[in-house]
Amino acid sequence: MIEKMQGSRMDEQRCSFPPPLKTEEDYIPYPSVHEVLGREGPFPLILLPQFGGYWIEGTNHEISSLPETEPLQSPTTKVKLECNPTARIYRKHFLGKEHFNYYSLDTALGHLVFSLKYDVIGDQEHLRLLLRTKCRTHHDVIPISCLTEFPNVVQMAKLVCEDVNVDRFYPVLYPKASRLIVTFDEHVISNNFKFGVIYQKLGQTSEEELFSTNEESPAFVEFLEFLGQKVKLQDFKGFRGGLDVTHGQTGTESVYCNFRNKEIMFHVSTKLPYTEGDAQQLQRKRHIGNDIVAVVFQDENTPFVPDMIASNFLHAYVVVQAEGGGPDGPLYKVSVTARDDVPFFGPPLPDPAVFRKGPEFQEFLLTKLINAEYACYKAEKFAKLEERTRAALLETLYEELHIHSQSMMGLGGDDDKMENGSGGGGFFESFKRVIRSRSQSMDAMGLSNKKPNTVSTSHSGSFTPNNPDLAKAAGISLIVPGKSPTRKKSGPFGSRRSSAIGIENIQEVQEKRESPPAGQKTPDSGHVSQEPKSENSSTQSSPEMPTTKNRVESAAQRTEVLQGFSRSSSSASSFTSVVEETEGVDGDDTGLESVSSSGTPHKRDSFLYSTWLDDSVSTTSGGSSPGLTRSPHPDVGKSGDPACPEIKIQLETSEQHTPQMGC
């Protein structure tokens, strides 16, 4: 009893193993070519290998009555070249028309490039969507009336491919993006093809016999003339298909054809170099064995077996056998064979698969060869290679679109950030770099004749002459040619506001001057004066705008006059521009203009003396630091609008004079 129960448990725990892989003995082999040739004819054009692996099209070649054999109809109605259906969609529907391109990165699908277009088909509005992934291109046309609400870009992408899982798409801002996209889409379209042509004589059943044939029968010569034109390879200018057109190492002539703007070069076995003593004829197999599709021409009734030729590339064969057709021309029987993983390709063969020589058959045969190569690309071996190539090209396209779009927005990479200090590229940063280099060169020229005593400014734009350490540090920085003191930004809009006010000219306010030195103008009291520049004047400086902390100073501190400043008696004088804002009750910014002695505002060229850069150079004269006086009464000394406050700078002509307040 126990043994019986244990036995049943053992049976329940047993599982069935998968059937073992079939060996050659398990297959029902097809008859070999030698067995078939031992029988009575006629023989088929193609025999499947003993253990399969290929499919055949066109097995019926019985001609009951010759007059009933009809030639193929016009190729424009039934003969069509097959290619990737989505390869030309962008050129046809998007290129040169209003549309939008986006890019993104999906964790599962990889790089994505998305194109969308509003389209009107008939009287109905549609969205035409084209999504490119590393595996394929998805295309769909969706009526807007079928949507409950107008979708965003991510939702549109999910409409055409449900596997999309991204948070957002980034717009493409590069003007030449359409060229890059159409090049990627059409990389699968080829206008150059190379096909092998193998001549099989009666009784030839091996690769060595096929490649050892040198002579050409009249029927084979006629077929080659029908297939294309004979060309000399020396200095041939068309598509050469890997043949040597310079040194003649691959023969002297070949067969070439231009069909529907597609160049075709045929590798004819009898025209390739023949090597004595080489049973394999590697010079011939090197070219034909690397082709994907080959034509096998049979003079007489001898079957062709696809595995006769050992090749990893040859995936499809079109076998043509000549048949006497009387005065109307020869007849050609056609059969097609390809590996199992190659999908069926058109145009389909008629029944019976017999053609009369003529332009219709040439159209059919060349179309069949081109479509065969496109179909072979879908085989497992070529599909993996195509997928890797497509993924690499899509990644390159993604990076190009991303880099150029960032550049158009002025957002550079890490290298640009290190070079520019604050980062960023584009037009504005390029312009700033040009002005900065000009300011540094002018700084070096102006400081060559100056004393090391310099004026240091704080980040708020106010002078700090009583701080010897800070003044010393600023002086050292200014003494070195080509260097400028670095200052922190006063705020996010500091430099922009300086540019808006027009801090381009050096301004000085003098209320009272008893004995002005020779060579200097004495402006009218109460007006902002602009002193003419000398040849050795240093570069004008533009201190940053004051921060909020400095704006809340007490009224008493604003009216203090910093004493102890003197002016150099040198005729070659330089100027220091100091700008401060007097903020009103409502906090509005006040624009200041440079006013001449007659009260007429001066127009200034912001491109010539622009100092709104974030890291603008600050240079001053060789004298001591002047004092800054803020007028407590905005209407004093101002000839214009009394609502606008005025900034005045008190300067002394010599050390003996005491500064006066500009009240």
Curated annotation (Swiss-Prot):
Modified sites of kind Phosphoserine: S441, S484, S499, S515, S541, S542
GO molecular function: GTPase activator activity; protein homodimerization activity; small GTPase binding
InterPro entries the record matches: GoLoco_motif, Rap/Ran-GAP_sf, Rap/Ran_GAP_dom, Rap1_Ran_GAP
SMART domains for the chain: GoLoco (SM00390)
Protein name (Swiss-Prot/TrEMBL): Rap1 GTPase-activating protein 1
Annotated GoLoco domain residues: 1-17
Membrane topology according to the record: Peripheral membrane protein
GO BP annotations, alphabetical order: cell-cell adhesion; cellular response to glial cell derived neurotrophic factor; establishment of localization in cell; negative regulation of microvillus assembly; negative regulation of neuron differentiation; negative regulation of thyroid gland epithelial cell proliferation; phagocytosis; positive regulation of cell-cell adhesion
Expressed in which tissues: Detected in brain cortex and striatum (at protein level). Detected in brain cortex and striatum.
Domain spans labelled Rap-GAP: 181-397
Biased composition (Polar residues): 450-467, 535-549
Keywords, in A-Z order: Golgi apparatus, GTPase activation, Membrane, Phosphoprotein
Function: GTPase activator for the nuclear Ras-related regulatory protein RAP-1A (KREV-1), converting it to the putatively inactive GDP-bound state.
This protein's record includes keyword Coiled coil: no
GO cellular component annotations of the record: axon; cytosol; dendrite; early endosome; Golgi membrane; neuronal cell body
